[in-house]
Each structure stands twice: as C-alpha cells, then as structure tokens.
Amino acid sequence: DGDDNNSGFLEGDAKRTIGAAASIAQGGDTIIIRSGTYVENNPIGLRTDVSVSGEDLRLVTIVPQNRTKDVFHVRRGCLIQNLNFSGPNNDGKGGVSYNHPNCGAVAFPPTQAAVNAGVDFQAVTGFTEIGPANEGISGRWRSPYIRNCTNFMTGSIGMKINGDYANANFTGSTDLGQDLKSMVCDSFTQYNENGIGVSLSNNAYAQLVSIFTIATDIGISCVTGGQCDLTNSNSSFGNVGLKADGIGRTEFTGQVFTNTAAENDSIAINDCKDSQGRFRKPFDGQGLFFKINLADYNDTTATGVLNEPMKLIRGINVIDGGLPGDYNPAAPPLVTVPNPLGPEAIIPEFSANVSAAGTITSIDVLSSGRNFLPNQSFTVNVSGGGNAQLEADTDPILFTVAIASEPTITGLTTITFNEFIPYKVNAGVDIELRRISRIITSSHSFEYIGAGTDINKANPFQGGVPITENEVIAINGGQVPFTSTDQKGNFRIGEGLVVDQTTSTIRGRDFNRAIQAQLTPLILALR
C-alpha cells in the first residue's frame, strides 16, 4: 500500500499517494502507479518534464477529493498515461452520481490572478507553485502529452487547456516561436456525461488524436481564440459535437500603409506588431478588422470610428412563434431588421416558415446581409401584427489571413485575405488582428449527437433522436472546417455538401451552386 513517510525511490519503499510522490519528483522522473484506486487531495501539481504512468488503463483509477478542482496540473514536457479518472464508487453506479463542475482531469497551473479571482485553484499537493507554465531552462516548449486514459468524471472537462496559464516567459521575456500554449493527446476517451471532452480557450492550441467523447455536453470546445487539429476521433450522443465560438483578444496591431481601393483581397500594413511591440508576421488562423472612420464614406449617415468588427446576421431564433391563427401559411409574414449602416452594406433577406396552426416555426436566412455596425439595433420585426417574438444571432465580419509577407524593419507586411474587402480603406487606418476559435478535423465520426447526455435515454433503442445541426456549431466568428460521417453513413464536407448514402443522393448549398454554374442555357438546349 505504501506510506507517504517512505522515500518513494524504491518499489518496496513507495509513497501511498500520487500527491506525495509528485512533491519529490524532479524533471525527468517517472511516477509509477501500481493497480488500485487512489483517492487524492487535488489539484496535484507536477514539475516540468515529470511523467505519471499507471500500470494499465483499467487497473489504475484516480478519484479527486475536491470535485470542483482540477486533478493534475501539468507543465512543459509532462506525460500522463494509463489512468482512469472517476468519481467515488460508493454510489452503486460507478461514481457517475457525483458531479465535477469545472474539474479538469488535466490542466495547466492557473495564474495568481485567476486564483485570487476564484476562477481556478492552486495545486495543494505535489509541486504547488503557481502558474503559468513555461518552457523551463531548456528554452524550448514541449507540449504536455496525455495518452491512453479514460475520464469517467460526470460534468468534468477531460483536457482543460487555458492559454492564459501557459507562456514561454521563463527568462523574463517571451521567447518567440516557443509561445505555443499547447497540449497533445493520443487516445483519451471522454465518458464524462454532461461535461466537456476538451476545452481550449485564450489562444490555446492542441493536436488531438483518437479523442472519443460519449454523452458530453460539448465534445470539443474552442472559445476565445482556442484552436485545435482533431484526427481519427468520434463524438457519440451528448448535446453538441464540435463547437467553435468567438474570437480571441487582440494579438497584433498596425496601420494601413497606402490608400486601398474597394474589392481588393490584399493590403499593406505598416508597424504590424504584437502587444510587446515586436514586429510580427500575420498568419493563417487570424482575422483582421479595420477601425475605419465612417465619415470617410458617402453611403452611410453614421459617424465615428469603429472599435469592433462590423457584423452579419447568422440566424433568426424563434423565441415565441405567436398564437394559433396569428399568421397565414399561404402568405407568410415579412421578417425584417433595421438596415445595416456600414459602408457598402447589403440588406439581409429572410423567409418565415408558418405551421398549419398559424404559428411561426422557423426563419430561413436567404441572405445574411453585410456591414451592420457593432452597436446597431437588431430588433426583428414581423409584419401582420401577430404575437411572435424573434431574435437575431450575429457574427463579426473578419478578413481571415491566407498568407502574409515577412515584416520589414519598419513592420511593413502585405496580407492576402481569403475574402475581398468591399469598401475602400484609407492610409493610416488602424487595424487589429485576432485569433479565430477554430477546430480543423477530417473523417470525424458523429453518432446520435443532440440526443442528450443521459446515456440511458440517448441511445436509439430508448428513443434517442439525433439533431444533425448540433454536430458542428461555429458561431461568433468561430470556424470548423471538417469532413464527417454520421450514424447513417452520410458523408459531409463542411456545411455545404452532404453525400446521403441512404438515398444515394448529393445535396447541399455548395452542390446546388455548382450545378447551377454548369447547367447553362446552351447545355439545356443541347439536351
């Protein structure tokens, strides 16, 4: 059984708890855990380059005493492998009755500011120094590595990767190129009902292989600039599969170098630098917006300088469809919002779907519009005087970086975007570059996503019903480029193309556009 008064350096003189072993483990050491269930006073902190290795995946179980706190705090070069994470087994249900809100099985050590704010908690056993993690004396970041583990902690987060808790500032200044804020993973099963499989925030990054999420609230979540590459993975049951939400804080700033005409997809930016004043090259995964002065444009009556991106309308939510008989299915009401007030604006178009009972069930967005001002009203109006209440969802308009040139000694770089800039931009206009929350995945498997987090009700033979729209959610500027297969074998390439194997058909927005482009009047006449 071991004893925490033992030296811990020999198997016959082993420590009893992982926390005690972690307190003496130095860089390069491996904590070997023999089979058993270990109830630990957590968080357990690890020094740089310390490994924790269980005897086998099904033989070693970690049970945290503090269910609202992280289990392991890892740093540069740490390895966690061959472990189970679980709630106490005294509920007769394998520990699933115990909730673990905000508990990360593996996380970076929080900063003092986060601890003071009560957002996260400092390690109480093992290496208890406060975060953030850094690259250590090596001067080179090596991502913590999680391999061959299973998370059974209900409501928990398997990998909680907060970029604010990791940087490359070991010597007093950030070592460029090492500021990766990253973890890597191979084979980490998330059977944490109503939890999150992997959470990435604040410009964190991860490379994830063989992540299997089961009955989670969100399988993989990227927010505030978190990004990941996801390979050979699966999301089964639960509420949401993959979700990218929002953009991060400002990374780079600069000024437009020369007057640039409308409909250009590249622009020269001078003095392009990060928050510490160092000239930087913009990169794929960032989005830019211009702090234009509205007085420079003749097609808007608005004034002032923009400090946030302009917007488009992503969708219209039906809060209340109205009373029976309010609307006519044969003549649906008009749905409108105030016109966008930015330069080169486009008015959105919507189509209401009305049930036989005369209530609004949903709204189709025919055109998202363009260049709504950040502080503009998005009140949704419905003609006909019924009682429906609708609400607009918006996304920021960012010009995403395709390529950029190396900055000169004055920070001058030319950025080419994936989109065209619809309006002119004058020299001297300030710009901001922000990290996009993004999940990139190929061949992802979805099964019954949207059926809920109770596995006893979400499976199909208990009546579980999947919601296809919940497989991938990209909102508020987030992106999820993906290919996937669902429980029916239907193959999707992003949001625009579906290969339906049940009906042997191809459908989707992008397919329809391609067909329309090919079926010219001449082709139709020849046929």
Please name every model-derived segment.
Residues 255-446, 450, 454-456, 467-469:
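Conserved, function-critical positions that sit in or immediately flank catalytic
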Residues 34, 41, 47, 53-55, ...:
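Feature marks extracellular polysaccharide-active and adherence modules
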Residues 19, 23-27, 39-53, 60-82, ...:
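Extracellular beta-strand-rich solenoid/capping regions of secreted or surface-exposed proteins
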Residues 33, 51-54, 79-82, 116, ...:
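All-beta strand scaffolds that present successive hydrophobic residues in beta-strands
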Residues 456-527:
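Extracellular "spike/adhesin" assembly and maturation modules
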Residues 18-26, 39-47, 52, 70-74, ...:
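Short, T/G/N/S-enriched strand-turn elements that build extracellular solenoid repeat scaffolds
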Residues 1-20, 37, 55-56, 508:
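Right-handed parallel beta-helix/beta-solenoid
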